[in-house]
């Protein structure tokens, strides 16, 4: 008997779901949200039970990888228990989480025990003052303690996510890489995405391409092309000097990954976003709440939604905002 498969109208198999469990965050990163962010009222967001119901239906329809995101997922009460329930779903191969690392010093071990298979940890600077400026509230030492706690808990292939911005942190690329090598971490360098209206800097002026990052790395290291994949948008390389770690480049502007896109996102409000860079969406919260105890209705809504998935986003690296919602509202 063949496995169920979600397919879009371009015959792309969709087997990767990113689920936001909260729009709230203890950081206010300059590229992610406004400093005086207004968060959603509690009644507008999905309950943990509703998030689990969506995960169950997606896995039943062939999803093999789920990533929990935020906001900062670890500030939501009960998230470790949610992880345990999702990780136990028959057929799911990977349960990952993207986090800013601020809570990992106390939660890394419980997450590992709950069945989370891999962590992505955001880290854009190793300078405490600059880190504070970029996150507006963050404590670098606490994040590094969280990274070390993840290693101690048993996580492997933990990945650092670094958003590279010209004039803000591009001078730290190789220092971040050296940090990753020292702790046996993978790292992805990410081009800034034009989500939400920000005031801290001009996106046109701060744009720093993946090609520029590779050129900077080549000043100190030897990059070797790799066929590695984690089912996400990163294109991977390895280093001759440290072959055990992977270097990824997420390039929504300069080398977009739309043609092989295999993922959809769900916001904490229950909006199923078919593309990071478009507003095509389906309100799964409305389906859930109008049809309690009828999982087949939710499955049908998910299957039908695949036909709304566009071929590509329309990101450009000028100052125009293609999508008004902030990254924390989207699910990072």
UniProtKB/Swiss-Prot annotation:
The gene is moaA. [4Fe-4S] cluster 2 binds at residues 258, 261, 275. SUPFAM superfamilies: Radical SAM enzymes. Residues 9-220 form the Radical SAM core domain. S-adenosyl-L-methionine binds at residues 31, 71, 122, 193. Coiled coil: none annotated. One of its GO terms (molecular function) is GTP 3',8'-cyclase activity. Its cofactor is [4Fe-4S] cluster. InterPro entries: Aldolase_TIM, Elp3/MiaA/NifB-like_rSAM, MoaA, MoaA_NifB_PqqE_Fe-S-bd_CS, MoaA_twitch, MoCo_biosynth_MoaA/MoaC, rSAM. The keyword Cell cycle does not apply. This is GTP 3',8-cyclase. Pathway: Cofactor biosynthesis; molybdopterin biosynthesis. Monomer and homodimer. Catalyzes the cyclization of GTP to (8S)-3',8-cyclo-7,8-dihydroguanosine 5'-triphosphate.
């Amino acid at each position: 008997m063949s496995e169920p498969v979600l397919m879009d109208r371009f015959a792309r198999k969709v087997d990767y779901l990113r689920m936001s469990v909260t729009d709230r965050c203890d950081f206010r990163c300059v590229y992610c949200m406004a400093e005086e962010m207004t968060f959603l009222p509690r009644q507008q967001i999905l309950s943990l039970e509703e998030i689990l119901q969506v995960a169950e239906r997606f896995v039943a329809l062939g999803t093999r990888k789920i990533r929990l995101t935020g906001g900062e997922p670890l500030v939501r009460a009960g998230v470790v228990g949610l992880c345990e329930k999702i990780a136990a779903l028959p057929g799911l191969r990977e349960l990952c989480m993207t986090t800013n690392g601020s809570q990992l010093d106390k939660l890394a071990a419980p997450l590992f025990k709950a069945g989370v298979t891999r962590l992505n940890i955001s880290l854009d600077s190793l300078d405490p003052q600059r880190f504070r400026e970029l996150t507006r509230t963050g404590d670098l030492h606490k994040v590094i303690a969280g990274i070390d706690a993840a290693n101690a808990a048993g996580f492997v292939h933990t990945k650092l996510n670094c958003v590279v911005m010209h004039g803000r942190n591009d001078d730290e690329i190789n220092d971040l890489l050296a940090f990753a090598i020292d702790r046996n971490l993978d790292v992805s360098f990410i081009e800034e995405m034009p989500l939400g209206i920000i005031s801290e800097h001009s996106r046109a002026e701060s744009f720093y391409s993946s090609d520029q990052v590779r050129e900077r790395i080549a000043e100190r290291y030897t990059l070797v092309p790799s066929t590695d994949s984690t089912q996400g948008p990163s294109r991977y390389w390895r280093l001759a000097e440290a072959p055990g770690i992977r270097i990824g480049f997420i390039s929504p502007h300069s080398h977009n990954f739309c043609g092989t896109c295999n993922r959809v996102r769900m916001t904490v409000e229950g909006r199923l976003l078919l593309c990071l860079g478009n507003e095509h969406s389906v309100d799964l919260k409305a389906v859930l709440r109008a049809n309690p105890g009828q999982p087949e209705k939710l499955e049908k809504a998910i299957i039908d939604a695949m036909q709304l998935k566009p071929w590509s986003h329309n990101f450009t690296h000028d100052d125009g905002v293609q999508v008004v919602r902030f990254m924390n509202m989207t699910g990072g």
